[in-house]
Amino acid sequence: MILIIDNYDSFTYNLAQCVGELGYDVLVCRNDEIDIPTIKQLNPNKIIISPGPGKPSDSGISLDVISSFSDSIPILGVCLGHQSIGYLNGGRIIKVSEIMHGKTSKIYHNNEDLFKTLPNPFIATRYHSLIIDNLNFPSSLAITAWTENNIIMACRHKDNQMLRGIQFHPESLWTFYGQQLLRNFLEYS
C-alpha cells in the first residue's frame, strides 16, 4: 500500500489516481488526520508527501513523517514535500523570482534513480512560489534535477537514498513522463 500524506492540495487526488493507475493500492490521509503510531500500524510500502499551500512548517505531520520513516520506508516529496525535505536537512526555503503556477519548464537531470528512463531534458509543470535555495543547499542532499536557470527541481539524501524530493508535479497532464517517474519511484525503491 502507498500512503499519500495530503497537505490540503487540489492535486493530491490526481497524484493518487496516477499511482492507482500503475496498479498500486493507495491510502490518502490529510496531514492533520493521522499520527505516527497509525502510520507504523499501516506499514506502508512507500510514502508520498503531497504538494500543498504554504511553507514546510505549515505541513502538519509531514515533517514528522519524513523524520520518522525516511530510514525505513522510501519517501517521495512532491513540491511542498520536496521543500520539506530540504527544510528538515537545514536548507533555506526562499521565494522563487518568478512564481510558477501552471507553467512548464525543461527539467535537466542526472540520468539516475527516478530519472533513469526519462529523456534529458523533459518538460514538467510547476506550481510553486517557494524553492530550496541552491546557494545554501544542505550538504546531506544531492541535487538530482534542475532547470536551465539552476533552480533545484529534485534532490536525494546522500546517505539515506530512500528519501527523494521533486519540485515539479508528475501528476500534471503537461508533465511528460510524470507517470514513468512515479513508476520508477514505486518499482525501484
From Swiss-Prot:
Protein's UniProt keywords contain Amino-acid biosynthesis: yes
Catalysed reaction equations from the record: chorismate + L-glutamine = anthranilate + pyruvate + L-glutamate + H(+)
Chain segments annotated as coiled-coil in the UniProt record: none
Catalytic residue positions: C79, H169, E171
Chief localisation class: plastid
Sites where the protein binds L-glutamine: G52, P53, G54, Q83, S129, L130
Gene Ontology molecular function, alphabetical: anthranilate synthase activity
Pfam family, one: GATase
Domain named Glutamine amidotransferase type-1: residues: 1-189
Keywords for this protein: Amino-acid biosynthesis, Aromatic amino acid biosynthesis, Chloroplast, Glutamine amidotransferase, Lyase, Plastid, Tryptophan biosynthesis
Cellular localization per UniProt: Plastid, Chloroplast
GO biological process: L-tryptophan biosynthetic process
Keyword Lyase on entry: yes
GO cellular component terms, A-Z: chloroplast; cytosol
Matching PANTHER family: MULTIFUNCTIONAL TRYPTOPHAN BIOSYNTHESIS PROTEIN, MULTIFUNCTIONAL TRYPTOPHAN BIOSYNTHESIS PROTEIN-RELATED
Quaternary structure note: Tetramer of two components I and two components II.
More info: Component I catalyzes the formation of anthranilate using ammonia rather than glutamine, whereas component II provides glutamine amidotransferase activity.
Protein's name in the database: Anthranilate synthase component 2
Organism: Pyropia yezoensis
